[in-house]
């Protein structure tokens, strides 16, 4: 039985990966009058007078909505919201297991931006935060931006920002090991979708020396007439030397590569053309842009992938549980760039200096100290930037 067959069998046994459990014991008539009618009327009236009391009198303060339209589920494409439910349930289970954050899956049967935004906005008062998941680009950018204007709780598209945060953490530590300064390096991102653009923005915020983005048409350069709005925005702040050409052209002399694209796009010759001690994060799943052994044989100094069977797994699970735990703890109204940067630095800091090496640049996914450290850093950054409400 392979892993796919075993997973299907487990899902049949589980009949869902999450369930609702009562925090209120209802064992007798008195319990019933307190948890439900008539006693429940009093907290309702208190919330009516002061909506912020919803954080104290309900579970809202620890509840995240995990929402998809099913348009970009894993590598499966647009399979629809319902078919994406197993992924959303899995995400909710990870929130609970790693950060004790309650999460609820919501799969929306629509690909219309305004319909999705309005649906989420209308139910947002039930939650303390919104995690958007597996929504295709470029629609995901518009949905997130419009939602941020409509609701006063954090909205976080994990495929963008969770990935970017972990890549940022990995790059910080990789540069330490390779004795490179982030402000001096040239980094190439292959794949200018949701994750690629978010990674680029965070690395620019981090102070990267030169960032070059590549999509299926080649190197993105300001003035290219085929660029969509998101790409045009990135073109203004990347590719300092106005390079044109292919991925191979972009990688010549580059210090680092981040792949969020397709399998086997990077060759040994491309790696050999890079600067000394090249850093490669080949994150296409399940087959990376270049396999680690091939990259190492070609001279790669540090290699990371999205897979757990190779060193340096770049996995969002070390980011999103702690990020939301920290944001919820201070009732943040947003998860801003400073909070994302704080999360990345906290993750990087979870690898002890004396253990940091080319095959250990990120903490283990099961290191339970990571979400705690991330939550503390995120909450602190929220207070410092004025988005914390307690």
Predicted features along the sequence, with ranges:
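ADP-ribose/adenylate-binding Rossmann-like module
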Residues: 131-134, 256-310
């Amino acid at each position: 039985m392979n892993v796919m067959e075993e997973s299907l069998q487990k899902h049949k046994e589980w009949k869902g990966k999450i369930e609702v459990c009562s925090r209120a014991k209802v064992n007798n008539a008195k319990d019933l009058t307190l948890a439900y009618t008539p006693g429940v009327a009093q907290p309702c009236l208190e919330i009516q007078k002061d909506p912020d009391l919803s954080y104290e009198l309900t579970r809202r303060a620890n509840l995240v909505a995990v929402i998809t339209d099913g348009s970009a589920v894993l590598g499966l494409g647009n399979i629809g919201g319902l078919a994406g439910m197993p992924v959303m349930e899995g995400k909710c289970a990870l929130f609970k297991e790693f950060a004790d954050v309650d999460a609820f899956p919501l799969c929306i049967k629509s690909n219309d931006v305004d319909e999705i935004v309005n649906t989420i906005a209308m139910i947002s008062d039930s939650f303390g935060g919104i995690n958007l998941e597996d929504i295709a680009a470029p629609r995901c950018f518009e949905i997130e931006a419009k939602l941020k204007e409509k609701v006063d709780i954090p909205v976080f598209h994990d495929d963008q920002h969770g990935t970017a945060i972990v890549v940022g953490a990995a790059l910080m530590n990789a540069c330490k090991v390779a004795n490179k300064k982030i402000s001096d390096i040239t980094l190439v991102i292959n794949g200018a979708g949701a994750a690629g653009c978010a990674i680029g923005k965070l690395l620019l915020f981090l102070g990267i020396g030169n960032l070059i983005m590549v999509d299926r048409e080649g190197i993105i350069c300001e003035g290219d007439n085929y660029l969509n709005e998101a790409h045009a925005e990135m073109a203004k702040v990347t590719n300092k030397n106005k390079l044109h050409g292919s991925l191979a052209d972009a990688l010549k002399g580059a210090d680092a590569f981040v792949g969020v694209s397709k399998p086997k796009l990077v060759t040994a010759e491309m790696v050999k053309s890079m600067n000394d001690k090249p850093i490669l994060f080949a994150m296409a799943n399940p087959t990376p842009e270049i396999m680690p052994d091939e990259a190492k044989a070609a001279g790669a100094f540090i290699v990371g992938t999205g897979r757990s069977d190779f060193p340096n797994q770049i996995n969002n699970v070390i980011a999103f549980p702690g990020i939301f735990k920290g944001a919820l703890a201070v009732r943040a109204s947003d998860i801003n760039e400073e909070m994302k940067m704080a999360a990345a630095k906290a993750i990087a800091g979870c690898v002890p200096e004396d253990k940091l090496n080319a095959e250990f640049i990120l903490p283990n996914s099961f290191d339970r100290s990571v979400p705690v450290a991330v939550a503390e850093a995120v909450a602190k950054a929220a207070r410092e930037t004025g988005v914390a409400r307690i």
